[in-house]
């Protein structure tokens, strides 16, 4: 019988890297802002977006995408925001139903259960002009349906 690495392990680890500016709430007036408003009431606002009214080019209605991206790259996550992210991802540790990541399975099927051993968010690191964090996911029972994240 041949060794099958894909099925011979009892857990997997995946690490994802993303810029911290992805954690900034949506720009007021954006499609995402209005979508969240319809679903959840008023979405959170963030002082990051104050530059649109105060620090951007006052002759334009909107700051160009390049200026917005430069502003995002200069943004740094605060301790409270990082701790809130860690608390949020911590809720996914343990055993949970990952039905949405399976194929042709009923929601109540016990085979949808997956166990997240560890979800770890690193301290931010600046590369170039952008601040990055990594998220480590260490889970069991993810081989069959290849659940890579949430």
Go through the PLM ranges and name each one:
Residues 1-150:
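Structured-RNA-binding interfaces characteristic of tRNA pseudouridine synthases
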């Amino acid at each position: 019988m041949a060794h099958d690495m894909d099925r011979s392990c009892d857990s997997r680890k995946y690490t994802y890297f993303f810029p911290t500016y992805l954690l900034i709430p949506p720009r007021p007036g954006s499609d995402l802002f209005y979508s969240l408003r319809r679903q959840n009431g008023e979405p959170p606002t963030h002082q990051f977006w104050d530059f649109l009214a105060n620090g951007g080019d006052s002759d334009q209605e909107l700051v160009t995408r390049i200026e917005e991206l430069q502003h995002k790259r200069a943004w740094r996550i605060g301790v409270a925001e990082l701790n809130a992210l860690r608390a949020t991802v911590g809720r996914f540790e343990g055993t949970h139903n990952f039905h949405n990541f399976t194929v042709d399975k009923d929601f109540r099927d016990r085979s949808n259960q997956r166990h997240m051993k560890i979800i770890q968010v690193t301290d931010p690191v600046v590369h170039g002009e952008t601040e990055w964090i990594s998220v480590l996911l260490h889970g069991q029972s993810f081989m069959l349906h290849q659940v890579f994240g949430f």
